A protein has these predicted regions:
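Conserved structural scaffold segments of CAZyme catalytic domains across common CAZy folds
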Residues: 67, 74, 96, 121-123, ...
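Short, solvent-exposed coil/turn linker segments
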Residues: 80, 90, 125, 164-166
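Glycan-recognition surfaces
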Residues: 1-66
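Intrinsically disordered, low-complexity coil segments
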Residues: 28, 39-40, 64-71, 98-107
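C-terminal beta-sandwich/jelly-roll accessory domains of carbohydrate-active enzymes
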Residues: 131-182
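Catalytic cores of secreted or luminal carbohydrate-active enzymes
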Residues: 47-99
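Carbohydrate-binding surface patches
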Residues: 102-147
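Conserved, mostly hydrophobic/aromatic
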Residues: 50, 125, 153
Length: 182
């Protein structure tokens, strides 16, 4: 479902957060690299925001230009992660909204969204800073995991990973995000 023509951050992130309260995430179509979404925020935010819904990609540069290899690598890796890890459970994901109230999220400077597979074997949490974010730490508490299971947690920004129990993730992990709209 094309839920909005507003693809510009930070509103696009807020729309995804809100629409996943009414629709399953695989029915929330999110576009990357089109309809002015390139005007604000990092490419990371646009791509990762789209990964939490039905991801649609547009062109990432003029047809006659050579694509920036860093952009190509990031988009390719992200699409691979989406296809191999998120999309297999997206149509039946349990959705949790750590920041359900847009007004409160704006005051806090960030919004987050958690998707978990029905068998609780995999999940993803996206955290996105808004225009008011001045940089710093954000405490995230998973809500949909199994407390007794152990999960390999991968931090997509730097690729680091660690093993954590569901109980530890539900107590919270801290993410450092240095800037707004990332």
């Amino acid at each position: 479902t094309w839920v909005s023509d507003k693809q510009t951050a930070p509103r696009s992130i807020e729309i995804t957060n809100g629409m996943t309260m009414a629709l399953p995430p695989d029915r929330v179509d999110r576009l990357v690299a089109g309809m002015t979404c390139h005007k604000y925020a990092s490419l990371d935010q646009h791509v990762r925001g789209a990964m939490l819904g039905h991801m649609t990609l547009n062109v990432f540069g003029p047809a006659t230009a050579e694509m920036n290899p860093d952009v190509f690598d990031f988009v390719s890796r992200s699409v691979g992660l989406y296809k191999s890890f998120i999309r297999p459970f997206l149509n039946e994901a349990r959705v949790y909204h750590p920041t359900p109230d847009c007004k409160a999220a704006r005051a806090a400077g960030y919004t987050a969204l958690e998707l978990v597979s029905p068998d609780q074997k995999r999940g993803v949490i996206g955290v996105f800073t808004l225009t008011g974010w001045m940089g710093g730490e954000i405490d995230l508490r998973a809500r949909g995991l199994n407390r007794g299971k152990t999960y390999r947690v991968t931090y997509d920004n730097d690729g680091a990973s660690e093993l954590l129990t569901g109980a530890a993730l539900m107590r919270g992990v801290t993410a450092f995000i240095p800037s707004a709209l990332s």
